[in-house]
Amino acid sequence: MSIVTVQLGQCGNQIGFEVFDALLSDSHSSQGLCSMRENEAYQASCKERFFSEEENGVPIARAVLVDMEPKVINQMLSKAAQSGQWKYGQHACFCQKQGSGNNWAYGYSVHGPRHEESIMNIIRKEVEKCDSFSGFFIIMSMAGGTGSGLGAFVTQNLEDQYSNSLKMNQIIWPYGTGEVIVQNYNSILTLSHLYRSSDALLLHENDAIHKICAKLMNIKQISFSDINQVLAHQLGSVFQPTYSAESSFHYRRNPLGDLMEHLVPHPEFKMLSVRNIPHMSENSLAYTTFTWAGLLKHLRQMLISNAKMEEGIDRHVWPPLSGLPPLSKMSLNKDLHFNTSIANLVILRGKDVQSADVEGFKDPALYTSWLKPVNAFNVWKTQRAFSKYEKSAVLVSNSQFLVKPLDMIVGKAWNMFASKAYIHQYTKFGIEEEDFLDSFTSLEQVVASYCNL
């Protein structure tokens, strides 16, 4: 089944390009470690999900590009065409000459209604090209104006017009030190609106990806392109084909539906994270070998201790003994030592994958008490390697991973709101103080729900 990607704003369009580039590069990789027949099935499954095809055989991304300034979209169109491997559709873009100035209200209340019909028409045409449509993958930031404000508006429209189709938003969490002075306002407005209209929020923290680039990839001068390539690698390792549960020879048809079914059992809990292992530079890779036991041991401890990468894992954190209250029931003011999960999905790719033992992820102590481990954990596999790694593992988790960052953003936004700082920039475009209060209430409930797991 096909997925239509909606790229919103500078951030969404730059990441979207890297995702499509990573997907196609991987599907054409010769390091697959599997037979030609399997490789062809893998390529066909990838193309069905993310690409249509021109008469001349060039893959065209199933994507809609939206921005209020033309510069970034033009760059991405050009880069895709120059790759010679794939390109964007000729009529798949919508851009204007005026940005949103990092103002969420302007993106949501001005650009959204003004351009709603044009944007939704382009999306409709892209959906109509799909023989079998699964849903939308929406890539956006949450701190700026276009990606976040217009992104929330477009997602709401998709929910209204495609209520039976799945919607997953991939959201970039801003740097803690701040790129935009009103980023906390923009963030709470984005998250609270998406919580009402999206089926799942796949969140990536800029700070965590930056550390992966610096410490694991050994990149000295880290650019946004470096960060976006790590993000694209993580997303590709989630969405590339894996075998279905019924067969080791057929790839699953509906990755979005399967992800939602396994990871979002309750609408109160929609926040998903991705952890990927290994991450390393080409130079280090040549001298490193991996075992499934080693990779999965690291990945499990990353989950338990809420580590974003394999370096610097706290190995002193353990699940609570049965019968004892979990440490995570402590108040937010104390450290959340143990990361309780609602649901986890492990995706394994590479050599000898059938021998990998995932029993450690079935431990009932890892999960909330209201879901049985048999329902809370799932594993997907394929012996086809991903990217440059002979063996790789991905953990997609619905857990308490973002409780502290979310609580901090809500707290910072509340402090600004209490002093009425910058509120006039929002009210003049129709976002009233009541809208802020609704957002605070909504997200405080999300924090409380995750804390009480």
Swiss-Prot record:
InterPro entries: Delta_tubulin (IPR002967), Tub_FtsZ_C (IPR008280), Tubulin (IPR000217), Tubulin/FtsZ_GTPase_sf (IPR036525), Tubulin_C (IPR023123), Tubulin_CS (IPR017975), Tubulin_FtsZ_GTPase (IPR003008). The keyword GTP-binding applies. GO terms for molecular function: GTP binding; structural constituent of cytoskeleton. One of its GO terms (cellular component) is nucleoplasm. Keywords: Cell projection, Cilium biogenesis/degradation, Cytoplasm, Cytoskeleton, Developmental protein, GTP-binding, Microtubule, Nucleotide-binding, Nucleus. Disulfide bonds: none annotated. Pfam families: Tubulin (PF00091). GO terms for biological process: cell projection organization; microtubule cytoskeleton organization; mitotic cell cycle; positive regulation of smoothened signaling pathway. SMART domains: Tubulin. It is found in: Nucleus; Cytoplasm; Cytoplasm, Cytoskeleton, Microtubule organizing center, Centrosome, Centriole; Cell projection, Cilium. GTP binds at A143, G144, G145, T146, G147, S148, G149. It comes from the Eukaryota. The keyword GTP-binding applies. Belongs to the tubulin family. Acts as a positive regulator of hedgehog signaling and regulates ciliary function. Found in a complex with TEDC1, TEDC2, TUBE1 and TUBD1. This is Tubulin delta chain. It comes from Homo sapiens. The gene is TUBD1.
